[in-house]
């Protein structure tokens, strides 16, 4: 039996997507840490830039706002996507521990609840993937350990 480490660790990642890869990466990192450390949770940080895009992304639209195309996608995928989103939400609710919801204005102070914050995995530093300053952990107020786990970018320099 492993000796459990007594630390509070927060994971800052794209846990809120409706993408199998992103959600499963969040889950895998959570489970790995949870087996070794008491007090692991995914920080329920959802950038405001994502909230406005959630609807059209869930019905399979990118940036195509052709009216005929939008109506067709709504009729074909609307019901399926709302069910899929519910399933993702259910999976997150029952498979990982989430912190209370935080946003840009509360994240800085919320991080002080942790001894360590792990950023990643996935493309958390990619400009095309909603690169948010929060994922760079440039907060001077946070005195805990800052760790990058498999964080990557689609460009050579960030």
Predicted region positions:
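Extreme N-terminal starter segment of soluble prokaryotic enzymes
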Residues: 5-10
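Aromatic- and Gly/Pro-rich donor/ligand-binding loops
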Residues: 11-20, 24-25, 29-157
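Short, Lys/Arg-enriched N-terminal segments with co-localized hydrophobic residues
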Residues: 1-3
